[in-house]
Amino acid sequence: MPPRRGIEVRQAVGDGAAPRWRMSLLENTFSSFLQSIGGGVAADGAAARAVFGEGSLFSPFLFGKFFDPADAFPLWEFEPEVLLAALRRGARTTVDWAETDSEYYLRADIPGGRKCDVEVSGDDAMRVVDVSGLWRAAPPPPPPDGRDWRAGRWWEHGFVRRVELPEDADWRKVEAFFDDGEGLLEIKVPKSGDAHQAAAATA
């Protein structure tokens, strides 16, 4: 089994705001894709079907509501029990998160994922973690005009999700790990020093 490895967490440069994905997606785009998912997508579509069809954090239909991947998902507004209950209805717990006095912890199953990248960005208004990756099947050759996969039918190549962090998260110190064998992503987000000290004082 491939070892669990650390992922270099890139920090966005410039004004601190990560760029939005270039292609705004519509629900009917995914509806037609899901109807024809039986072939051509990562091992006869099993990986994409597992992610898109079972309430994964990376599903465009998370909790029955369409999420454009350009929109940051406020994961921390959900109680863990509520989040997991929705996923258990699909008979697969694909995401978990927890909070301690010192950090936030996110763990997500990404079936069929073979590569995972994490980028963090932030400013005074919002702190966002961008998670993206590729399916195990080799992606098709890039288009001749040089556009990257985020500009086209990205769901045939991989997955993406933007996760909004809470205000007390120290976004500059995010750590990420990925298990290539199990497709398990782990992200640790330490709390800021002031938040940590306040929690310790009230303990």
Swiss-Prot record:
Give one GO biological process term. response to heat
Classification via Pfam families:
HSP20
Q: Which SUPFAM superfamilies match?
A: HSP20-like chaperones (SSF49764)
Q: Which UniProt keywords apply?
A: Cytoplasm, Stress response
Question: Membrane: present as a keyword of the record?
Answer: no
Where would I find the sHSP domain in this sequence?
86-203
What PROSITE patterns does the record tag this protein with?
A: SHSP
Task: Name the domain of life.
Answer: Eukaryota
Subcellular location field: Cytoplasm
Asked if Chaperone is a keyword of the record, the answer is no
Listed under GO cellular component are: cytoplasm
Protein family according to the UniProt entry: Belongs to the small heat shock protein (HSP20) family.
What does the subunit comment say? Answer: May form oligomeric structures.
Q: What is this protein called?
A: 22.3 kDa class VI heat shock protein
Q: Please spell out the taxonomic lineage of the organism that makes this protein.
A: Eukaryota, Viridiplantae, Streptophyta, Embryophyta, Tracheophyta
